[in-house]
Swiss-Prot record:
Cofactor dependency: pyridoxal 5'-phosphate
A Pfam family: Pyridoxal_deC
Single GO MF descriptor: pyridoxal phosphate binding
The name this protein goes by in its record: Tyrosine decarboxylase
Family: Belongs to the group II decarboxylase family.
Function: Catalyzes the decarboxylation of L-tyrosine to tyramine, which can be converted to the hydroxycinnamic acid amides feruloyltyramine and 4-coumaroyltyramine. Possesses low tryptophan decarboxylase activity.
Length: 533
């Protein structure tokens, strides 16, 4: 990927983004053997200022970078030494920052770019980033209450704060007998919930019947669930992917779920776990939580987990809370605050109605984990028993800072601004007869495609015509993403229909970026159709 056109060169012609300043080189980084300086306050302050300036200038000039790099595999490995230096390099930190600028930044996909529309957001904020820095600087390992009492209790406070901000059922909060924790991703969350459900069920029916357990999802459920099922020992053939259809806006049908569960019961199998999704990755479809919970309850108390990784953030807005109607009956729910709530990667909050099931499945009692006398006689939370890892990060600190500094109203405004921009983009699509919106927009994702010429004439395309229409849209996406300083979008194939995805959610995205993106789409469509005659 070529650097922005306004770049100038340094170091004998190496390209450099003019927005990012030269790095100070007046003091060398202390040698690792000089332990007195490894965490020297003055050195930390000096280098820290350089990093803050570097990041600030990166954000200031981010709009000048192509969103996605045009590089080939091995491009970076060829430019870096095969071995780490045996001794500190001269001016090592400054040299490393220059390499970040000149070698690494040109080869990353700029997820914070205002023109990044390909994926659900990995939202950043000043407070979120500085909260990460603060947690890294304090660097505690809060696996038990005794290991870091304040970190544990802040996490308990934060998950209840966040749960109330999202209007979750009281039964999922510590205040209501449930509880929550902050993990890295929804992949971890669904795995932990599945293991808890598995062990609870096997305690009831016997461990020998693990081969009879069956789990359920839709064909739109994130692949992380299938991976979690394999890790948990569920055979591939016992993971039921229930087909969805366009008539149901790609949501999981309660009727189809009941039929699948009943067929398994009739075959002597044991329904175990349902993963419902609120805001699927491909189209943001919303599974009907209340109705699915009712089906699960009819089949021996199947554990219901709601994956709201993306759309869960929208629950801060009252107008979206209907999407989890019936959630008081779920066993667990997870959402990624790093996707849309300004908390920076990584930050997945998960709540469970019965924490005891989680602790029973994941708890440990090793002697080397020291207990604090102050905790004796108290019902403390040891978060090592709520996840798969012992070492864990102090993620609650940044979430606490985000909630304090932006407030729930600030988060609502943030989400609503993106929803409004998505609505504007949707209106632009509908205003051009050459295009169609393929799936209903619920949040800030617009799924659309270019109609083939027969479709625009009202003629059915048939199987062969559908294939041609899909190829037409594949070409359109390639052309859109190839545009210099243009938008970066992605695709989905749902119900045999290939569509473009425009996911609006970058903290830096403004209305002008959305209008410019649509202009590029229109121009590329015009060019493609003209060439086709």
């Amino acid at each position: 990927m070529a650097p922005p056109s306004h770049c100038h060169t340094i170091n004998g012609g190496a390209p450099r983004n003019g927005a990012i300043p030269e790095v100070e080189t007046t003091t060398s980084t202390p040698a690792a053997s000089d332990t007195a300086l490894l965490l020297d306050a003055d050195e930390f302050r000096r280098l820290g200022h350089q990093v803050v300036d570097f990041i600030a200038d990166y954000y200031a000039g981010l709009g000048d970078y192509p969103v996605h790099p045009s590089v080939t595999p091995g491009f970076l490995r060829r430019q870096l030494p095969a071995d780490a230096p045996s001794r500190p390099e001269p001016e090592a930190f400054a040299a490393a920052l220059r390499d970040v600028r000149d070698l690494i930044l040109p080869g990353v996909t700029h997820w914070q770019s205002p023109r990044h529309f390909a994926h659900f957001p990995a939202s950043s904020s000043t407070v979120g980033a500085l909260g990460e820095a603060l947690a890294a600087g304090i660097n505690v390992v809060p696996f038990t209450w005794a290991a870091s009492p304040a970190a544990t209790e802040l996490e308990m406070v934060v998950v209840d704060w966040l749960g109330r901000a999202l209007h979750l059922p009281e039964s999922l909060l510590f205040a209501g007998g449930g509880g929550g924790t902050i993990l890295g991703t929804s992949c971890e969350a669904v795995l932990c919930a599945l293991v808890a459900a598995r062990d609870r069920k096997l305690a009831e029916i016997g461990a020998r019947r693990i081969g009879d357990l069956v789990v359920y999802c839709s064909d739109q459920t994130h692949f992380a669930f299938r991976k979690a099922a394999r890790i948990a020992g569920i055979p591939r053939e016992h993971c039921r992917e229930i087909p969805t259809c366009r008539d149901d806006v790609f949501a999981l049908s309660p009727t189809a779920l009941h039929a699948a569960m009943q067929a398994d019961v009739d075959a002597g199998l044991v329904p175990l776990f349902l993963c419902a999704t609120v805001g699927t990755t491909q189209t943001t479809a919303v599974d009907p939580v209340r109705e699915l919970c009712a089906v699960a309850a009819r089949h021996g108390g199947v554990w219901v987990h709601v994956d709201a990784a993306y759309a869960g953030s929208a629950l801060v807005c009252p107008e979206f809370r209907d999407v989890i109607a019936g959630a008081e009956a779920v066993d667990s729910l997870s959402m990624n605050a790093h996707k849309w709530l300004l908390a920076n990667n990584d930050c997945c909050a998960v709540w469970v109605a019965a924490p005891s099931a989680l602790v029973a499945a994941l708890g440990t009692e090793q002697e080397y984990i020291l207990r604090d006398a102050a905790a004796e006689g108290h019902d403390v939370v040891d978060y090592k028993d709520w996840g798969t890892t012992l070492t864990r990060r102090f993620r609650a600190l940044k979430v606490w800072l985000v909630l304090r500094c932006y407030g729930v109203e600030g988060l609502r405004s943030h989400v609503r601004s993106h929803v409004a921009m998505a609505a504007a983009f949707e209106a632009m699509v509908r205003g051009d007869a050459r295009f169609e919106v393929v799936a209903p927009r619920r949040f800030a994702l617009v799924c659309f495609r270019l109609r083939s010429p027969p479709e625009r004439l009202g003629v059915g395309v048939g199987v062969g015509g559908e294939k041609a229409a899909n190829e037409l849209n594949r070409r359109l996406l390639e052309e859109v993403n190839a545009a210099s300083s243009g938008p970066y979008m992605s695709s989905a194939m749902v119900g045999g229909v290939y569509m473009l995805r425009c996911a609006i959610g970058s903290t830096l995205t403004e209305e002008r970026h959305v209008r410019e993106a649509w202009k590029v789409v229109q121009e590329r469509a015009t060019s493609i159709l003209r060439k086709r005659g």
